[in-house]
Amino acid sequence: MIKKYLVLILCFSFQQLESAEKSEILLAMDKYNEAFILADYDQIIENFIFPVSIITSDRMLSIDTKFGLRFVYKKIRGDLPEFYSYSKWNNIDIQVMDKNIAIVSASFSRYDKNEKKFYDGSGIYQLKKIDKVWKIFSLIPFQSIETL
């Protein structure tokens, strides 16, 4: 009988821990998105841990400095059309690999100043928990995915 209660308590504790981790990761993703919307480069950088890896279909970047990451994000953000207003997460799937590493698969939409969606995209974000805070260390943005 005691074993059953112990198992129930352990399962409940694990679910609470899992839920807390998910909330912390979602908070990190939301902080990153908000900084991106505001073009707040200092805050964008605060969401990362170095070195940062950004992999696109065209190139692979390894960024070791805040200056380098700021440069990349000014380019990314600067290439958006003038009518860009905000981005919104559509779906976020989280896999925690161990207690300090997570892989986040997220889809998002970008909207103009009239609330009209003009772009759908996705990304794979790898995060590491440092001093109890989840930070991004790798990003793979893409527009579509094909299952083989």
Where on the chain are the PLM-derived regions?
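Surface-exposed, charged secondary-structure patches
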Residues: 67-113
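Sec-dependent signal peptide recognition
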Residues: 2-8
